[in-house]
């Protein structure tokens, strides 16, 4: 009887979530067939292009692309957030900001759009390798968040 109730609960939860339109986030969902990306730092630009390619959206030159994106600025900063009593860093804040504009083929540029992602993490000199790896993962997650936000805004534009 308990197994039946557990299965019934799980099934009803799945039905409820699917009925309300809930979807797990997956790859980039876009309503355009090709994109051109210029500007920005080489590492961010490369990551952005890779994410669009993984979603099946080809990267074209500006003359052939349906959407044209120009990254005006992408800036990553690392700020000390707090110190221990001895003056050692105990917490950092990571900020990643991207300013860009886009247009469809044969239309004027839209206004500049700035998006940002912030993360904080604790720091300990005793775990320097682990904390460096944590920082890399946080930065990668911030880039993914910014890229998904950009893709959503591009898809919602006419």
Spans of model-derived segments:
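Bacterial signal peptide processing site
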Residues: 21-24
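Surface-exposed short loop/turn segments
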Residues: 70-114, 121-133, 148
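C-terminal/domain-edge helix-coil "capping" segments
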Residues: 129-158
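Sec/Tat-exported extracytoplasmic proteins
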Residues: 52, 56, 102, 106, ...
